[in-house]
């Protein structure tokens, strides 16, 4: 009897330890290592997330950093409470609907609007770190900066993926002098793969923030530097003020939650459009037997594409900053509205035209053309107590605005607004306004199984493909019973509007003839996808990273687990 009791007790302890197994997944192994270092020191998921964000600002400067912002959802294991953090960049108070109009009185094109100072929003990432550290951190603030500061000071090697971005960017005409010297050789060619680059300016800046706190950035000397940098830009100067920086605050709106086949899915609230639109895609598919169709069915992918088109159309029409416009989230997710939208989808044909619907609570706005999005970094962490942080951070386009200060790049987030404020005589929801935050595709999500157990923490990078990446992965996990790794690795059909893209060299692209028979007109092209996740199966935490990226998952042993590119092969078996 005593033996059986002791055995049961030990099994309980083992199961509890496994369930709370510390782990991270991030877009770069050096960032993952920074997160694991914090977990080894007894830090929380919040501590690990901060260390990873700081490290990504060093080794992924094309995508994120203190010059940007993002969204994070946090699960407190003790209370079960979910907190959604909105650290999206904000427009200066002086901004208005004509912010991106040129000297000719006409709206700029996106390529003309990005470079310089006017596209820069008030950064939110550092205030995000401050908020989650105050709410959930255990380690000292300055401890969180140590790994990233060392990376910046001692140097980091240029990776093939990062080098590819450098070769696609012109060394002159976009970057300022510091950036050109940091990333390019004197002859204007990108520094080679494997070159170790050092960023003493950023190392010093991290040191100052570690000592003086975030106010050094928002009300101290760095605030004056930032304002001078964007207002003094030789191209597209801004009208940002010190007051814009001093007044910036992280919001904590209620998470957006919904159900799909008994699973509860929760994520960041608008202006993050991702969780709402992911839920729409899934809910519109719920009347179809996606499990029976399976991942290798052209009909399943056709249905996914059609549901995506409808949801993206509603995104472009209705999603924006809820502090400035009425955003009908409840109406978009209402069962009667979902039923009406889903009824437009047919398994045997493609819709001739795509238009937004009219959900309950919809204001009088017009759908506008979506703005292109490119950058972002995604990360997730779980600590020994079972707390979970899932974040997506960004400076928007690759290298943001091209403007830099203190060794970091400043965002071009304001070009996520609609550059044209009106369409057909009506204002667009996502137009520029002073203090407003632009719509985002970011989709940090937590998923609970029908028994209420945490099943998945997932996010992605890659602009507007983020929504499709995450929705596809959830169909894979929930309907097709794939592991999170296989669901992320499987190919994507990205269809934000008429037509779409079947990802090159994947099973989805191989279905093109059959999809054409259903009326789909698709291109085939590579997609720069970058999802990551941690899933829980039978009480065991398992990390997942995208084989298309340089991302990894990592446990306390410090070993980076990177999926092989072969995981994209079309005949990979299901689990």
Predicted regions and their residues:
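N-terminal signal peptide c-region/cleavage motif recognized by signal peptidases
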Residues: 10, 14-17
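Internal maturation/activation junctions in enzymes
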Residues: 287-394, 403, 546
């Amino acid at each position: 009897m005593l033996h059986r009791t002791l055995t049961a007790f030990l099994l309980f302890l083992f199961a509890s330890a496994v369930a709370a197994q510390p782990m991270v997944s991030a877009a770069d192994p050096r960032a993952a290592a920074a997160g694991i270092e914090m977990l080894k020191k007894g830090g929380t998921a919040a501590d690990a997330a901060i260390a990873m964000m700081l490290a990504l600002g060093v080794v992924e400067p094309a995508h994120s950093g203190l010059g940007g912002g993002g969204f994070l959802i946090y699960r407190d294991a003790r209370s079960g409470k979910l907190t959604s953090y909105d650290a999206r960049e904000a427009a200066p108070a002086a901004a208005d609907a004509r912010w991106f109009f040129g000297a000719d009185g006409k709206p700029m094109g996106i390529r003309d609007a990005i470079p310089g100072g006017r596209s820069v929003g008030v950064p939110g990432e550092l205030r995000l770190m401050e908020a989650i550290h105050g709410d959930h951190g255990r380690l000292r603030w300055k401890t969180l900066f140590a790994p990233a500061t060392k990376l910046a000071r001692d140097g980091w090697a240029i990776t093939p993926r990062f080098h590819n971005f450098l070769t696609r960017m012109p060394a002159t005409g976009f970057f300022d002098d510091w950036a050109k010297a940091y990333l390019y050789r004197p002859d204007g060619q990108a520094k080679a793969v494997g070159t170790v680059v050092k960023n003493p300016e950023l190392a010093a800046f991290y040191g100052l923030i570690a000592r003086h706190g975030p106010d050094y950035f928002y009300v101290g000397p760095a605030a004056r530097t930032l304002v001078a940098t964007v207002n003094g830009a030789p191209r597209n100067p801004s009208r940002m003020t010190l007051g814009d920086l001093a007044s910036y605050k992280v919001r904590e709106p209620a998470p957006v939650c919904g159900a799909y086949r008994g699973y509860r899915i929760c994520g960041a609230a608008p202006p993050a459009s991702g969780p709402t639109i992911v839920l729409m895609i899934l809910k519109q598919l719920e009347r179809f037997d996606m499990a029976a169709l399976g991942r290798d069915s052209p009909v399943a992918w056709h249905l996914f594409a059609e549901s995506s088109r409808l949801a993206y159309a509603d995104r472009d029409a209705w999603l924006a900053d809820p502090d400035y416009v009425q955003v009908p989230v409840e109406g978009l997710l209402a069962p009667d509205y979902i039923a009406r939208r889903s009824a437009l989808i047919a398994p045997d044909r493609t819709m001739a035209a795509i238009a937004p619907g009219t959900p309950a609570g919809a204001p009088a706005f017009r759908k506008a053309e979506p703005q292109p999005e490119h950058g972002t970094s995604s990360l997730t962490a779980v600590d020994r107590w079972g707390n979970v942080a899932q974040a997506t951070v960004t400076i928007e386009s690759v290298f943001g605005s091209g403007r830099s200060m203190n060794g970091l790049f400043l965002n071009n987030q304001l070009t996520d607004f609609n550059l044209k404020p009106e369409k057909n005589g009506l204002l667009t929801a996502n137009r520029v306004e002073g203090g407003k935050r632009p719509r985002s595709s970011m989709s940090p999500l937590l998923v609970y199984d029908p028994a209420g157990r945490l099943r998945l923490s997932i996010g992605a990078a890659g602009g507007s493909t983020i929504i499709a990446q995450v929705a596809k992965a959830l169909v894979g996990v929930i309907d097709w019973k794939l592991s999170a790794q296989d669901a992320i690795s499987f190919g994507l059909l990205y269809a934000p509007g008429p037509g779409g893209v079947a990802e090159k060299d994947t099973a989805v692209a191989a279905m093109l003839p059959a999809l054409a028979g259903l009326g789909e007109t698709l291109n085939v092209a590579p997609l720069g996808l970058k999802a990551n996740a941690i899933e829980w199966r039978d009480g065991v935490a398992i990390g997942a990273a995208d084989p298309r990226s340089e991302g990894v998952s990592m446990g306390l042993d410090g070993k980076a687990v990177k999926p092989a590119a072969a995981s994209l092969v079309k005949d990979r078996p299901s689990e």
